[in-house]
Amino acid sequence: MSNGPDQSLKNRVRERAKLAIRGGLHRLDLDVSKGVYTRQVARTLAARGDDTVLDIGANVGQYGLGLRRSGYDGRIISCEPLSGAYAELERRAHRDPHWHPVNAAVGREPGEVDIHVAANSYSSSILEMTQAHLDGAPDSAYVAVERVAVTTVAEVVERFGVDPARTLLKIDTQGYEAEVLAGAGDLLGTFDALQLEVSFVELYEGQQLAEQTIAVLREHGYRLQSLETGFSDPSGRLLQADVLVVRDH
């Protein structure tokens, strides 16, 4: 694949076109926003008095938009590294005074990193994709690489004056969840709730699997609140799920 200026421009145009199509599907309620589960998350936030959401791996803002449509009116801080996805996220957030977009990846430490851009945008990852992922989602192959800035959960908390005890930390980073948690440092056990996408099969090379991730969360005092199954391979084997964990008050 050529990395010249013409190819780079074509890749950006291709990504923006796909994002525009997804935006249209969202308006027709056909987007991948997982509306029913998002409403359940919003109810949990309301019941627990949480007024801030750190949306790590925001893509085009479908998670934040789903929360708003579900009645959540607190602060949302959405981090998205890819330029094309971030442009759509920024467009959605700019009229909402309590929705703050951040153009950066989130990881173990600040810096820069190359991220692989997937054909479907939302499967993009810092990690290499495995064949198991491609078999389960053939439209997710990588088509480009983009250099992006990296921040940490701890930095975002400090920058925005976040109170972790009233905050949901949501992480959807395509296999990079363990690195995001590492970047939270000592804050990990202080967030009131966490929502993560976990994998039962290695979909990205070197990623932490669901069993270990859930064990780490339990060690930090979290219990399972709810779970939504994600996508499966052609045989019906479950590959991913979203889990919501909370601290006991």
Language-model features, listed with the residues they occupy:
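Phosphate/nucleotide-binding beta-alpha loop and adjacent structural elements of enzyme active sites
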Residues: S2-H249
